[in-house]
Design a protein with these regions (language model features):
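Preference for long, amphipathic alpha-helical scaffolds in soluble/luminal domains
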Residues: 1-311
């Protein structure tokens, strides 16, 4: 991935089969032979959605029979008639953060069919007044408790048209990155406009501030957005946000400066970056939470610098 994304070398002679790596083998469910637990497909770190996403991060793509079987199983259980993806709750409702994330990984892996274009239309049609996305049936502690105890979705969709409710950072980055990935293979004015509006959502907030200007520290156990991790599903940090802004072509906007300088200031003397955030949805968030040097965070920072340098 470093050769491909940083050095620009994607020649066949440098390819390594990721399917044979220990990282991929660890993700395969021993009973079904699929990536992750398909019966509990929405679980972080063990469900098929997570294991599919991590496998794509590790280099697996649509040429892999293993990935194809897993994608088919996820489609069978999680895709909705409206084009979005649902979690394991009743009634079944599409949710923006997971729809955006899964679509992005499908596009990254090289998939291209009407289910993806329908999903992109779902995203475009649900962008909100502030340029972001929300579209989550959970709102507040009661809905969270209902989900945990009864796997019931809540009443959060009543907030969609409420302009006093700010869109969600997690849902917005998921949908925005999906649009960026789609734009690279099928550009359109509608997608360009949506990407621009989403970029403004983050830039107005310096990529980590609330509408009131204070740094966001989520109340649900997730940590400060200025702490770097490697978001996979339903997560965010400033490096993730900056990479989206870079893909949107706006990395030189002055409003990126504070977040960009924070990232640069975190580089270690040997050129690496540390894994600092282990919130649920971050890679390695289910393991040791000791801050340490990370090849994943370093790779992501180098991706950002490569795009910024070429802009």
């Amino acid at each position: 991935m470093t050769q491909r994304d940083i050095l620009g070398d994607d020649s066949p002679g440098t390819e390594v089969d990721p399917a044979s790596s220990p990282g991929i083998e660890r993700l395969i469910h021993h009973e079904t032979g699929l990536l992750g637990d398909i019966e509990h497909y929405d679980l972080f770190y063990g469900g098929s959605m997570w294991c599919f996403a991590e496998a794509v991060e590790r280099g697996l793509d649509c040429r892999s029979p293993l990935l194809n079987r897993t994608v088919d199983a996820i489609y069978e259980r999680a895709i909705m008639p409206d084009g979005g993806f649902t979690l394991q709750w009743e009634p079944r409702v599409s949710v923006a953060c997971r729809t955006g994330d899964i679509l992005r990984y499908l596009i990254m892996a090289g998939y291209s069919d009407t289910r993806i274009s329908n999903g992109i239309e779902w995203i475009l049609s649900r962008q909100r007044h502030d340029g972001g996305w929300l579209h989550c049936p959970l709102a507040g502690a009661c809905d969270q408790l209902r989900l945990v105890l009864f796997r019931r979705s809540g009443n959060g969709l009543t907030r969609e048209g409420d302009t006093s409710v700010t869109s969600c950072f997690y849902a917005t980055i998921a949908c925005a990155l999906a649009l960026c990935a789609y734009r690279a293979v099928d550009p359109s004015e509608a997608v360009d406009r949506a990407v621009g509006s989403a970029a403004e959502f983050f830039l107005r907030r310096s990529l980590f501030r609330s509408s009131q200007g204070t740094p966001i520290r989520p109340h649900d156990g997730n940590r400060d957005f200025r702490l770097l991790g490697y978001p996979v599903l339903s997560q965010y940090d400033i490096l993730h946000g900056l990479l989206f802004i870079a893909h949107a072509g706006l990395i030189h906007d002055p409003r990126c400066g504070e977040a960009f300088n924070i990232v640069i200031s975190k580089q270690n003397p040997d050129g690496t970056w540390n894994m600092e955030s282990f919130a649920t949805g971050m890679l390695e968030g289910d393991g040791s939470r000791r801050i340490r040097k990370s090849k994943w965070v370093t790779l992501k920072a180098l991706r950002l610098l490569t795009i910024a340098d070429s802009s």
